């Protein structure tokens, strides 16, 4: 008798990138009981070797192509900087590997289209890392929308805010990213997921350029948009990179409201439910050089370390990816590459509207 969720053979995993997310993915993969081979990579030799030692990787390299094409690698996680996803992802696809690309799928739309075309040509699965899908509160929205408690969705409102410390970390490593492409992307994905893949018809957006992030990097400090849909639905979504470094929610705060003909679901995700104040400053998990004496614990989007183990959405997403490769069973929560591409196109349309001040149709090339 065969069991569809039994992994008979081990799974070989390669992780490209040793930043906070790449390191976390590698540590999670190292702890997965079915991972029998682990390779890590970073373009900086010292970073690659240190991560390999930390997660007891079987091998490491400064060349992504070297590890993603290995015969003992089955699954590849691309967690390099946002503007360098394309080349290692393409190499992995062409080597016949199953690939998970951290959001955003790519920054340039033409690169995303090429990745999807290659995945189809080589017959491999490619996914996008939208970790928030695996958090209980956002999964609960999906389940209850599917069960009809909301009915036809009529409108939506959502916001996501980052601290300036996190924003500086993001923009300094990938100068071509934006608040929309990097951060509001989570809201675009969740909304499209709840709507069964329906995308907006138009986007109108405006952004602020009066704050510290714009002054330092030339990027918008915030972006606010209105999305309209062919069926009459409307959504108001916003992102801000303006919270002070010492803001107690040391990484991100989110709110999400979905309105329908039969009901409404509202999530207040600002982490005020677990508040700690201490004479000993608490370092931010994402930007450990930044500390605060009052902290809203749990505001690190991937999850948290406790008792030497990592718990939370990124662990569950990474496990879902590895399990899907090992069992051959598609995971129902993982975002596909096509879904990641759709979200990228919405993000790009919003940025184009903020740049031009015009309503931008989704038929815009991106």
Task: Describe the role of every protein-language-model region.
Residues 182, 188-276, 318-327, 365-366:
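Contiguous beta-strand/loop segments that form the cofactor/metal-binding neighborhood of enzyme cores
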Residues 74-75, 81-82, 86-133, 148:
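Beta-strand-loop-alpha-helix segment that lines the small-molecule cofactor/substrate pocket
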Residues 1-55:
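N-terminal Rossmann-like dinucleotide-binding module
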